[in-house]
Amino acid sequence: MTKHVASNLSKGRLEIDHNSHVVRIISKTGNYSIHKYQYSDLDSSDWGYIYEKYVGQKYEEEGFQVEYLGLHKGFLDGGMDIVISKDDFKAYIQCKFSTKSRACFGKQKIEWILYNASSFLSKQYKDKKLNFWLVVPTLALIKKELQEYFLSKNNFQDKVKLELKTIPMPL
């Protein structure tokens, strides 16, 4: 169902009904529902796309322009899900979602995220420091030493500033 969910998310606004355990995609005008999904029908990849849209909408509410690379390109997004910009600020974001409440990120996953980010960002660099954020619903997903490992790579080649951000998505 993943491709179908991502396609529908790119067409409208996300609404999550926690009481009914339903995810709705509403038209951008808010006049009608494009699609609705029961929680039980969604797999982990679907939830990943839903989280990307949720994070993007949070930044839209803060006045950022949001480009949804993950929703439009899927696994070909180059390791970057969202690009946000406002005035002369820009950040490249990788979103990672899990329904687990405990650490589930290993060092290999962090290295993979950094590898993909460096490949993508090297093509974006134009003599101005770039911002790369790893956004998760809770830092509990990443053990403290792996958070420190991620941040120890900060300012790699003095071109990119790394940050860990949390944006909770209640279910």
Please report, for each region that a protein language model flagged, where it lies by residue.
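Mixed-charge (Asp/Glu-Lys/Arg
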Residues: 1-171
